[in-house]
Design a protein with these regions (language model features):
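C-terminal beta-rich recognition modules with glycine/proline-rich loops and embedded aromatic residues
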Residues: 1, 15-37, 46, 50-58, ...
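Extended extracellular/luminal ectodomain segments enriched in beta-structured repeat modules
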Residues: 2-6
Length: 169
């Protein structure tokens, strides 16, 4: 109990900046974090990546910090030539990828995901001891150049190649 400040780390991905520089930017903006003390919203002092709450604290006070974990698209600075026209997919701090064995045809290089594609996040308890996967509809290009809609599944990049060697994009 007493008068003191509590500082909570607010990750850059919550503040519409995937990194603390201009190398990467989010295409889609999302809502900010919310902070409550004992169920009531508070407006903290922000600075240096922290939200600071200064007050008189009592035993049993509860702080609730809600960090939005929405699916985002990231693009790199246009001067990174190899990344022009490409986007990364992120949910919270996790970067996602497509792995061949999760796609109906086992391929990944024949697919693209339009920037406005709706993606849904769901926990898959059976996959790699449990991970959140993203699903949606991608565009698939066949050898004749025809394009069709196909379902896709994206997994956390950190889990790629944990089920054997496979293609990834």
């Amino acid at each position: 109990e007493g008068q003191f400040a509590v500082r909570l780390r607010i990750p850059s991905w919550v503040k519409d900046a995937p990194a603390n520089n201009d190398l990467y930017t989010y295409i889609n903006k999302v809502g900010n974090y919310t902070l409550k003390v004992n169920g009531s919203s508070v407006t903290p002092v922000e600075g240096d990546g922290y939200a600071t709450i200064a007050r008189t604290w009592k035993a049993g006070d509860v702080i609730e910090l809600d960090l939005p974990m929405e699916v985002r698209r990231i693009q790199s600075h246009d001067e990174v030539e190899v990344n022009r026209g490409k986007l990364a997919i992120e949910r919270g701090p996790i970067v996602y990828c497509l792995e061949g064995q999760d796609q109906a045809d086992g391929k990944v290089f024949n697919k693209f995901i339009p920037a406005d594609t709706q993606m849904d996040a769901a926990f898959d308890a059976e996959l790699l001891n449990g991970v959140v996967v993203l699903t949606g509809t991608a565009k698939e290009v066949d050898l004749d150049g025809k394009v069709k809609d196909v379902p896709f599944k994206a997994i956390p990049y950190s889990t790629w190649n944990n089920r054997g060697r496979d293609h990834m994009v």
